[in-house]
Amino acid sequence: MSRRVYMEILKILGQRLRELRMERGMKQREMAELLEMTLRNYQRIEGGEINIPTLTLCALADYFAVTTDYLLGRSGRRQ
């Protein structure tokens, strides 16, 4: 996978997490606590700056009732 594609996936992941979080009326701090990470790391995920572990991705998909493909931008359908 090229670096450009990798960075685009991280950007989409961050955008989708932000959208889902805001739909639930949650703050970034609440998401960070839910995921047991620092606020700064969560902000970096939403900013498309860092990747997340596979298990965290699966937990987020379950929490928001969406597919991992949706979170990664591989599908436009949430389910």
Please provide the spans of the model-predicted regions.
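Alpha-helical residues within the helix-turn-helix
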Residues: 22, 33, 62
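Short, basic-rich loop-to-helix N-cap that marks the start of a DNA-contacting helix
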Residues: 49-59, 78
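Short alpha-helical DNA-recognition segment
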Residues: 25-44
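A short, Lys/Arg-rich alpha-helix, primarily the initiator
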Residues: 2-23
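DNA major-groove recognition helix of helix-turn-helix/homeodomain DNA-binding modules
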Residues: 55-70
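Short, charged recognition helix plus adjacent turn
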Residues: 1-8, 62, 72-79
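Residue-level signal for the short linker/turn that defines the boundary of a DNA-recognition helix
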Residues: 15, 25-26, 52-55
